[in-house]
Every structure is written in structure tokens, then in C-alpha cells.
């Protein structure tokens, strides 16, 4: 989006819904370790994978995907509230429809990523990542995004945002 600098909007696919079994990706990771040690067999591992990852969507925690969705929303490149929706939800369906209306507005007014992705917008995104306790990968992604749009953003800018 930044490199092309054409009116555009980011639509996040959404997060996975919680498991009905009170298990998640962390459970699967733990079970992979148990399988590696020989504590459980392959069938048990597959069972935990099936009950822990029941449908589409990104990892349910504040890992890279959810962190970046939140940062991109704070940056102004996605619709408000769109980073916190489940992948399979009426809200996500509505978000997709609303994105169509929004992109038509951006096209009509010729609003480009360079008009939105300013230094201040990146600082706002960094602040949101820090407030959410998001993935440290966000620093690398935000630096790359800023570079793509020609915005001078440095790792020290992230440090400045969290100094009190």
C-alpha cells in the first residue's frame, strides 16, 4: 500500500475464536514439547491440535498478527475497531462491507497512504503497541512500513514513546 501510494485500506482477516475446550495455541506448543519428549503419542498431539485450533483466524494472543492489526488501525490504514474482530463474525462481515464504502471515499477524495502514514501516525501506532504489550516484531514492521512511505522513523522513536 505504501509503496504504490494509491488509495487503499487494510482489511484484517480477524482472530481465531477461543476453543470450547479451554485450550489454545500455547497448549499445542506445550503438547509438541511433550510429544518430542515422548510423554504423549502422535494421536494425542493431533487431538490437542484439533480441539485447540478449531477454525480460521490468526493466533488469539497479542502476537505479531494481532499486534500489527492494532498498529495499522492506530496508523489510520484500517477501519476503527477492525483489529479486534473474530475472523468468523458478523462484525468482520460488516467490516468488509464498510471497507468498500471507505475505499470509494478514499478514491473520490484521492486520499493516499502518504496522506495518512505520517510520522505522527507512526508514533501513535507505536504508542498503541506499547499500551497493548504487543509483539516486539512490531518495531521491525513499523520501521519497514515507514521506510516504504519515505517517513524517517528510527528505533529510538519507539524508545522515546515509552519514556516517562
Tell me what each language-model feature is:
Residues 154-164:
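Single conserved hydrophobic/aromatic residue that forms the stacking wall/gate
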Residues 140-151:
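Alpha-helical support elements that line or immediately flank enzyme active sites
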Residues 1-124, 128-129, 142:
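Active-site cavity-forming subdomains of large catalytic enzyme subunits
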Amino acid at each position: 500500500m505504501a509503496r504504490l501510494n494509491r488509495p487503499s485500506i487494510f482489511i484484517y482477516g480477524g482472530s481465531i475464536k477461543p476453543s470450547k475446550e479451554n485450550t489454545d495455541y500455547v497448549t499445542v506448543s506445550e503438547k509438541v514439547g511433550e510429544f518430542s519428549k515422548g510423554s504423549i503419542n502422535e494421536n494425542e498431539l493431533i487431538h490437542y491440535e484439533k480441539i485447540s485450533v478449531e477454525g480460521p483466524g490468526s493466533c488469539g494472543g497479542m502476537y505479531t498478527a494481532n499486534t500489527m492489526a492494532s498498529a495499522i488501525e492506530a496508523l489510520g490504514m484500517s477501519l476503527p475497531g477492525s483489529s479486534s474482530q473474530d475472523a468468523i463474525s458478523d462484525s468482520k462481515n460488516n467490516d468488509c462491507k464498510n471497507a468498500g464504502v471507505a475505499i470509494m471515499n478514499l478514491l473520490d477524495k484521492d486520499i493516499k497512504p502518504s496522506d495518512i502514514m505520517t510520522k505522527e501516525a507512526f508514533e501513535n501506532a507505536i504508542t498503541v503497541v506499547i499500551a497493548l504489550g504487543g509483539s516486539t516484531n512490531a518495531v521491525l514492521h513499523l520501521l519497514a512500513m515507514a521506510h516504504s512511505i519515505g517517513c524517517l522513523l528510527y528505533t529510538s522513536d519507539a524508545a522515546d514513546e515509552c519514556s516517562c
